[in-house]
Amino acid sequence: MLPFRSYVCEPLSWGRLVLAGDAGHTVPPTGAKGLNLAFCDVRALVPQIAAFFADDARDSAPLDEYSRTALDRVWRAQSFSYWATTLLHRQPEENSFTRRRRRGEFDALTLTESGRTCFADAYTGWTV
């Protein structure tokens, strides 16, 4: 069995160097967020690159803004992916209390409308 790993590089920009997608952040496959985050990065980065090249001084402020905006979204996705991984995957060292607590959390999530709504909102993502 392979461990799930997550990584976030902060910041996502250094001067003229910019990271996007898996180059800047990885998430475990549980939440299916990796490719969606990459697309969101590109969508947020394109106007900032245009602003960078529109300024003859090549001020890195637009690229720094991309980093701040992207990282807000990335950390929300990291939080969801971590939570979903710990909820849906039994850990080898898990004891009976933790297993039952995890099952109770899963039931609270799936057996109530508010739980299902919360999960759906987090799973489908937030506005870019």
Can you describe what each PLM-predicted range is?
Residues 32, 47-128:
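C-terminal helical "tail/cap" subdomain of flavin- and related membrane-associated enzymes
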Residues 34-41, 58:
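Short acidic-hydrophobic sequence patches enriched in Asp/Glu that either
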Residues 12, 39-50, 54:
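Extended, folded domain segments that form the structural surfaces/walls around functional sites
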Residues 1-37:
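FAD/FMN-dependent oxidoreductases across multiple families
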